[in-house]
A protein has these predicted regions:
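Short loop/turn segments immediately following beta-strands, especially the blade-tip
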Residues: 5, 44-52, 126-133
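Short, acidic, Ser/Thr-enriched surface-loop or helix-capping motifs
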Residues: 48, 70, 86
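Surface-exposed loop/turn elements that mediate protein-protein interactions on large endomembrane-trafficking
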Residues: 2-9, 94
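Structural signal for beta-propeller blades
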Residues: 1-2, 40-43, 82-83, 122-124
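Beta-rich, blade/repeat-based domains predominating
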Residues: 1, 11-32, 57-74, 78-79, ...
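Short loop/turn segments immediately following the C-termini of beta-strands
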Residues: 37, 47, 80, 109, ...
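Short, solvent-exposed loop/turn segments at conserved positions within beta-propeller repeat blades
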Residues: 35-40, 77
């Protein structure tokens, strides 16, 4: 897991133990979720003041291409389809999409629109909220 920035910035490796890709945004002290497709696991960690990850723990026994967290704290993992977990790591649902997702993120004015990037299309799904799809 790497930190990157503008061309005049320097990047550094967050973790030597994670094999993951996809974009996440986080500030120091914030909890993040990263997915390892090769291990088929999703991890939770806290971003330190220097950008390193600490308190690394398995969040879900499913990895994937991308992870996104909604405004209610539910965690979405893209792995062939979208698997949805509550903040405690319990799977609460699935979202089927017409093609394999390669990246997901939340947007919209209330952060309740899940944007799903496939190989040939961009999809948008409205989510309801805490522990609901």
């Amino acid at each position: 897991v790497f930190q990157q920035g503008p061309p005049d910035s320097s990047g550094w490796r967050f973790s030597d133990s994670l094999d993951t890709y996809g974009f996440i945004s986080a500030a120091p002290g914030q909890r993040v979720h990263v997915s390892s497709a090769s291990e088929d696991r999703t991890y939770s960690a806290v971003v330190g003041a220097d950008g390193t990850l600490s308190e690394l723990a398995i969040f879900a026994e499913r990895g994937g291409e991308s992870v996104a967290v909604d405004a209610s704290g539910n965690v979405y993992v893209a792995n062939g389809q979208i698997f949805v977990y509550n903040a405690g790591g319990k799977q609460i649902g699935e979202i089927d999409v017409p093609e394999r997702p390669i990246d997901i993120l939340f947007g919209g004015p209330d952060r309740r629109t899940l944007f799903i990037l496939g190989h040939h299309a961009l999809f948008a799904v409205e989510v309801r909220g805490k522990d609901k799809l």
